[in-house]
């Protein structure tokens, strides 16, 4: 038993009906002891079966020839139904005690199955299992057929899966009390898959959690940032939409209007006059608010402005309330004399200024246009988008201006550097010319400015380098004492020349 590998140990335990867990160095000895106990229990059960079957074995002798004939018929039909029989035998429980044939029948039937029994005996001995001699080749024959179809089914089959019937043959159908194949293996009939799942779960638990924690933090940060941006955008929309118009507030203000009851002073007259004036102002307020809202939301009525002319407003009020023009003028007079904001502006010839008297009123405009929620949202969204675009345009303009300034500064630096390089070249040319003159290699001690330019700048670059050359000439005239600019007549023409001035070796104090 000590020489069994882990796979063989697992198969032995599964064959005896025990489902082992992971086999490691610490659990291997435990499973070996378990296998030893299970084998001992199996031997005890086999001995009990031998003692119990000793009596019924004598009664089963006369049925030996019939059993031989039935087995011969089944062997002839076995090739035709080999595949279905294998699938049936996988789930069929082993019989507890098959009816043994008579001694004479067993000796006669040992011929066809003698080789199989002899080959199966060493396997049973290596497994540590003992089978009674009277049990016949039925269980072993079933084992051989099932092993021929699948090696894995042999490992998971247990020798103690027997039906409670004592005289049931091995080819008889299983009884209702037989235990299924999956019940013997436990909840998980595939130990290899269970072990692989356990191993993967252990590997997942040992995986470092730093990356997952960082992912969770980043996802939460993005979520809160998105919610913050959404709330900010909704707040901007709400601010741009403004508060909805409140006609009830205007109506409450209108209830404070004085009533024109000059001729009639009774309470009924005053109540009627007050109700009529409130109705007129309420209708006027609604009319102006709707017209102003339509003008702001697409202007479907093609209005010139949201300031409605007085005559048009008066005609509308007369059609709706059937009130005379005097009452309309009285309402305008009260609006002008009231210090409260009723939501109606009275404008004169200049739309930017409010009228002070009824005669100067040209048009009426609502201070709180009545717009739908869709129009308010679209206007707020348009305003927000416009402001954002203006901001980005300003930002782009400033960015472009900065890029332009940086480009300009870089060009100036490059031009200044080129000017210094040109000054160095001019000094070298003039100094070399003076040295050549001292060595009688040149006729004159000076050299023409244009001659120096033509020798330093190629023709195709003179237009591009003109600014650099002019700055170099100015720099030499104002900052270089070793080069003097003079005017000489050369070849009959006056020409500006440069002369190299050699500094004296001694100062006046040394002399």
From Swiss-Prot:
<dbReference type="GO" id="GO:0043409">
    <property type="term" value="P:negative regulation of MAPK cascade"/>
</dbReference>
<dbReference type="GO" id="GO:0035914">
    <property type="term" value="P:skeletal muscle cell differentiation"/>
</dbReference>
<dbReference type="InterPro" id="IPR003887">
    <property type="entry name" value="LEM_dom"/>
</dbReference>
<dbReference type="GO" id="GO:0000785">
    <property type="term" value="C:chromatin"/>
</dbReference>
<comment type="function">
    <text>Nuclear lamina-associated inner nuclear membrane protein that is involved in nuclear structure organization and maintenance of nuclear envelope (NE) integrity and NE reformation after mitosis. Plays a role as transmembrane adapter for the endosomal sorting complexes required for transport (ESCRT), and is thereby involved in ESCRT-mediated NE reformation. Promotes ESCRT-mediated NE closure by recruiting CHMP7 and downstream ESCRT-III proteins IST1/CHMP8 and CHMP2A to the reforming NE during anaphase.</text>
</comment>
<dbReference type="Pfam" id="PF03020">
    <property type="entry name" value="LEM"/>
</dbReference>
<dbReference type="GO" id="GO:0031965">
    <property type="term" value="C:nuclear membrane"/>
</dbReference>
<feature type="modified residue" description="N-acetylalanine">
    <location>
        <position position="2"/>
    </location>
</feature>
<keyword id="KW-0007">Acetylation</keyword>
<keyword id="KW-0206">Cytoskeleton</keyword>
<dbReference type="GO" id="GO:0051898">
    <property type="term" value="P:negative regulation of phosphatidylinositol 3-kinase/protein kinase B signal transduction"/>
</dbReference>
<feature type="region of interest" description="Disordered">
    <location>
        <begin position="18"/>
        <end position="110"/>
    </location>
</feature>
<feature type="region of interest" description="Disordered">
    <location>
        <begin position="128"/>
        <end position="206"/>
    </location>
</feature>
<feature type="modified residue" description="Phosphoserine">
    <location>
        <position position="509"/>
    </location>
</feature>
<keyword id="KW-0472">Membrane</keyword>
<dbReference type="InterPro" id="IPR052277">
    <property type="entry name" value="INM_ESCRT-Associated"/>
</dbReference>
<dbReference type="GO" id="GO:0071168">
    <property type="term" value="P:protein localization to chromatin"/>
</dbReference>
<keyword id="KW-0963">Cytoplasm</keyword>
<feature type="modified residue" description="Phosphoserine">
    <location>
        <position position="507"/>
    </location>
</feature>
<feature type="region of interest" description="Winged-Helix (WH)">
    <location>
        <begin position="403"/>
        <end position="511"/>
    </location>
</feature>
<keyword id="KW-0539">Nucleus</keyword>
<dbReference type="InterPro" id="IPR011015">
    <property type="entry name" value="LEM/LEM-like_dom_sf"/>
</dbReference>
<feature type="domain" description="LEM">
    <location>
        <begin position="2"/>
        <end position="42"/>
    </location>
</feature>
<feature type="transmembrane region" description="Helical">
    <location>
        <begin position="221"/>
        <end position="241"/>
    </location>
</feature>
<feature type="modified residue" description="Phosphoserine">
    <location>
        <position position="505"/>
    </location>
</feature>
<dbReference type="GO" id="GO:0005637">
    <property type="term" value="C:nuclear inner membrane"/>
</dbReference>
<feature type="compositionally biased region" description="Low complexity">
    <location>
        <begin position="172"/>
        <end position="183"/>
    </location>
</feature>
<dbReference type="GO" id="GO:0060914">
    <property type="term" value="P:heart formation"/>
</dbReference>
<keyword id="KW-0812">Transmembrane</keyword>
<feature type="region of interest" description="Required for nuclear retention and interaction with LMNA isoform C">
    <location>
        <begin position="80"/>
        <end position="141"/>
    </location>
</feature>
<keyword id="KW-1133">Transmembrane helix</keyword>
<protein>
    <recommendedName>
        <fullName>LEM domain-containing protein 2</fullName>
    </recommendedName>
</protein>
<comment type="subunit">
    <text>Interacts (via N-terminus) with LMNA isoform C (via C-terminus) (in vitro). Interacts (via LEM domain) with BANF1. Interacts (via C-terminus) with CHMP7. Interacts (via N-terminus) with tubulin; the interaction causes microtubule bundling and stabilization (in vitro).</text>
</comment>
<feature type="compositionally biased region" description="Basic and acidic residues">
    <location>
        <begin position="38"/>
        <end position="80"/>
    </location>
</feature>
<dbReference type="GO" id="GO:0022008">
    <property type="term" value="P:neurogenesis"/>
</dbReference>
<feature type="transmembrane region" description="Helical">
    <location>
        <begin position="385"/>
        <end position="405"/>
    </location>
</feature>
<dbReference type="GO" id="GO:0005783">
    <property type="term" value="C:endoplasmic reticulum"/>
</dbReference>
<dbReference type="GO" id="GO:0005819">
    <property type="term" value="C:spindle"/>
</dbReference>
<feature type="region of interest" description="Interaction with lamin A/C complexes">
    <location>
        <begin position="80"/>
        <end position="112"/>
    </location>
</feature>
<dbReference type="InterPro" id="IPR018996">
    <property type="entry name" value="Man1/Src1-like_C"/>
</dbReference>
<dbReference type="GO" id="GO:0006998">
    <property type="term" value="P:nuclear envelope organization"/>
</dbReference>
<dbReference type="InterPro" id="IPR041885">
    <property type="entry name" value="MAN1_winged_helix_dom"/>
</dbReference>
